[in-house]
Amino acid sequence: MYHLRKIPKKYGRMLTSVLFRLLVEPLGLFKVYWGTPKEEPTEPLPAPAAINIDTNVIEGEIDRLIYGSFIEVMGKCIYGGIWDEYNKNVALIHGGLREDVINEIRALNLAIIRYPGGVFADTYHWKNGIGPNERRKARRNKFWHWLGPKVGPKYNNHFGSDEFMLFMNEIGVEPYININYGTGTPEEAAQWVEYMNGDASTEYGALRAENGHFTPYNVKYWGIGNEIYGPWEPGYSKPEDYAQHYLEFAEAMKAVDPYIKLIAVGADFEYSYWNRPVLEIAGDQISYLSYHIYMPGKFLDSLSNSVQDFYNIISSAFEIEKRIEWVENSIVEVISNKEKIPIALDEWNIWWNVRQLYEGYYTLRDGLLAASIFEIFHRHANTVKMALFSSLVNVLPAIVTNPTDVYHNPIYLAIQLFATHAEQFLVSSSVNCETRHNPRYGKVSEVDLPYLGCSVTINKMKNRLVIIGINRHHIHEIPTKISISHFDPEPITKIFELNGPSHSAYNFFDKKNDVKIQEKEFSSDSSKFTYTFPAHSVTALVLHKNK
């Protein structure tokens, strides 16, 4: 157990801030409950629902960058997860990338990944991670080491900028780099841009070529700082100071490559003083305004599989929407066209216990939450143009590894279903269904939770329509009348259903497919039909237009 009197004075604020943020200490006292759900009172069947769709009304264009993720030098996310160079039990690519993990990530169909943090980014000096390995010194994780070796182990710097780009090329994903604002300088950031994007005639482009990578990487997305509004953060400052310093970074970085997109630190109403001065001072140089959200905003010893906790967690999606709307309004208060500076929700997840940083179990409940969050991202497609699940491997993870094996959890499957099947344009739709009142829980406001969620998308040619229905009822199916205007579907509809044996089902190494996506078919000879969405399921109905 840590004792504050034993902590060196210069680290006291950092540790206090971490504890303030996590509201938990020490790590080893917490247990996660994975038992059978307790018996709940029998509930009546919900009334049949209705979905009405008008394919002639396009409500927004969905940016594929909402299907993104995030990796940080923390726990076994990168070292011991994605990059495992000393592991002789698994096949490796490029001397360190785990092939089984790479295959899992490829199948996820992500569009973008952010690196190297997170809080870690504001302590990371990129030059320590380039060149021959023998020149790269092992480092202490300056921020996360206070939470012990499971969360903040030392790292050997063998996964640096070039290894990150090898990783990106292997999975075919857009890179997003967060520079060191907290302990770095504009000059250091500009040199990193030159190393990644400069041609071989430049000083740092030549260094990249010397390290074996002649062709520029052309990294487009660059973040300046991480959660600088927070007292836990290296570089913590007032919004006015952050904005002025942001402009110094932006000027230096764009002098090297004027075509890069810059992401500024934003916040929701918990830091309501933040966005206005940042936008007023630096708005002309901001490509995206970021903000982070972890729900339910309540740290617990355990989270049961009870029906009430099922609805407590799923209701978090609507708290996220409430906060997105607040951020949208904070932008439009300064910049009349709120779409001019879109939102990058570049960290989101469910997080209720510190153990999830190294023991990442998620149930079908959490997959339904993730699906409900994507429903909301689609609904706000005109403003939310980037969203990154945090994080990809082993830390609050979509993918979990041990030294010999890998599995994915229900949140992974929800991301995969949306990223694979949803189309580009959001179509007008309305849902008529029963709701359930859920009381306030942690930071989640009370809400009348619709049992049925829905997102309807169509491709540019308007010949492929995808209806994604989310049955948020813990035990009952929902028969649903679906009516589609201006689209005559072929009689056979492909169905992709994410589900498991109960709302508390989860995957593990010895039962990797308890929760899975199953492909089915459905027959209908009309644009008006009834489909029954199974209990606790996410279902994509893929319809093709009759020729």
Model-derived segments and spans:
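Short hydrophobic targeting helices and cationic amphipathic motifs
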Residues: 3-4
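Non-catalytic accessory regions flanking glycosidase/transglycosidase catalytic cores in CAZymes
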Residues: 15, 20-275, 279-288, 320-547
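Active-site His/acidic residue clusters
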Residues: 293-312
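Active-site-proximal helices and loops of the catalytic beta/alpha 8
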Residues: 296, 316-317, 321
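Extracellular loop and loop/strand-boundary signature of outer-membrane beta-barrel proteins
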Residues: 311-313, 361-362
